[in-house]
Amino acid sequence: MKKIIAITGPTASGKTSLSIKIAKKFNLEIINCDSTQIYQQYNIGTAKITKEEMEGVKHHLLDFLPPEEKYSIYHFQKSARAKIKDINNPLFVGGSGLYLKAALFDYELTPKPLMPQNVCEQDLQKMLAIIKEKDPQLVLDTKNPLRIISSYYDIVSGHLRSQKTKKNVPLYSLLIFYLDIDRKELKNRVVLRLEKMLNEGFVEEVKNIQTNFPQANFNIIGYREIKDFLEGKYSITEAKNKICQKTMQYAKRQKTWFKNQLQPVVVDALSPSLEKKVFQLVFDFLHKRS
């Protein structure tokens, strides 16, 4: 079974720096697992690694999509698994847990269907009846029209959602690290990083995307708030406060999700022995017989 390592954790926890050290020491190639860093132009606000910071380490699925192009977790699953086949020693790096799980665990996503417009209540009830007949084991939120429509199209295309039960079965031999960090220290880092981003031209970056790529995705922490600031909805101070608040809320959800879904090796991001501990675990993992 192929061996794959992943470095996860909240923003500003040190994933990038540690990943480069691991990749260089063990001759690994990095597969980006940050759903925002796949896009071109989104550089400062996503803390995208620079060419200099890469130190010659090869990166995949990074900075390759035009800002207005649609790309889903389905596309990432296909792209990442293709990369895994091509790369001898992959190292996933990023905080997008759903993307990571889709790439590494035994379930297949299907393309999201185009949802029909103006579906009436009668149509939804017909769809529900077919779902209950064809897939009676499925537990479905019957008050969510999008869920009903999506489940219906799954059945029409021959996929029963209730049978997609292998979500916790890995396709590969995995070593997943989660960089844990004291919440107070994380907040300090988030505030400092945001100030650095603003000094480096984050506002100008958002303005450029707004002007040249009006259909681009702004539903990203930081980009949404700066866009609202540029549109006069609130001051830069309010925007900064909202960015920090949302980043910390997201970090809390991330931690819970990763621990529950992926059972990672949790390591202290602030520990003086972090590098030594991780290197030893990686060495043991790569050299043990699978």
Swiss-Prot record:
Cofactor: Mg(2+)
Annotated EC: 2.5.1.75
GO molecular function: ATP binding; tRNA dimethylallyltransferase activity
Keywords, comma-separated and alphabetical: ATP-binding, Magnesium, Nucleotide-binding, Transferase, tRNA processing
Residue sites binding ATP per the record: G9, P10, T11, A12, S13, G14, K15, T16
Keyword Transferase applies: yes
Region entry Interaction with substrate tRNA, spans: 34-37
Key word Aminoacyl-tRNA synthetase present: no
Gene3D superfamilies: P-loop containing nucleotide triphosphate hydrolases
Top-level lineage group: Bacteria
Family (UniProt): Belongs to the IPP transferase family.
Function field: Catalyzes the transfer of a dimethylallyl group onto the adenine at position 37 in tRNAs that read codons beginning with uridine, leading to the formation of N6-(dimethylallyl)adenosine (i(6)A).
HAMAP family for the chain: IPP_trans
Protein name: tRNA dimethylallyltransferase
Protein's organism: Phytoplasma australiense
